[in-house]
Amino acid sequence: AARVCASRGHQVILYEATADLGGQVVLAAKATWRAGLIGIATWLADQVAFLGVDVRCNQLADQNTVLESDPDVVIVASGGIPNVGRFEGNGLANTVWDVLAGHVECNGQILIVDESGGHAALSCAEFAADHGAQVEIISPDKVLGTELAQTNMGAHMNELYKLKVRIRPDTRLEKLEREDDGLTATLANVYTDLNEDHRFDLVIGEHGTLPNSDLYFALKPLSTNLGQLDLESLTAAWSQTLAPNPEGRFSLYRIGDAWASRNIHAAMLDAMRVCLHL
């Protein structure tokens, strides 16, 4: 979003809560064969620097931050919060982010519950197995990676088999309980509903992300468009003209995971569609 806006001649301020640009791409690039993904973040960072974007790292933008900047347009790209899934005891589960960021140790028996069908759970399984853990991955689908192209799945399956990751399709996690020696996971077949208990040292839930939208909703009543998007104009990459609150101070849009769980390509397409005619 910052690159497109700056390339169109706008003065852009980019607030980044962490020390480096890149967000989830930085984590995704930590997986075994996906290190090249960091090139996306590196290229975009180089582009915004070249275009003169005012990048302010280690600054978590809030409502006051935005209002002090007196903007004409606000793009909320605040990302999402990991969603481990809906099962009894889900508070005992960790996230893919915990593993890839090194916040938990990858050893012992690890269960990964893939309910999104994307790269995240598979990359986590490969990362954990590569660091010495014995990994089992389950999915309610009949195959892994239902949201991925076959070219990507070939690379993933090669890694999973090479690292001896156990794969269990047609399976859901019903319940997770803390025991003295670890975690007990109740796994059920999605067709027969027959279940059985298994012990693990760590359980990782992957169900995409939930929008990190507090800033968006704080700014919404202050905006001319009340945070609304004309979806027909969005999909056609036309200008956004909605203005139900003409007394508002700025136009407000949210993109990527701040709107709904996205992959890299969809998030960048969101940004292009919204910003192309600003």
Language-model features: where?
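Rossmann-like dinucleotide/flavin-binding elements
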Residues: 1-21, 56-70, 77-150, 190-202, ...
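N-terminal Rossmann-like dinucleotide/flavin-binding domain of flavoprotein oxidoreductases
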Residues: 23-68, 148-180, 197
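Interaction-prone hydrophobic/basic patches in short secondary-structure elements
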Residues: 137, 178-183
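SH3/SH3-like beta-barrel fold
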Residues: 184-188
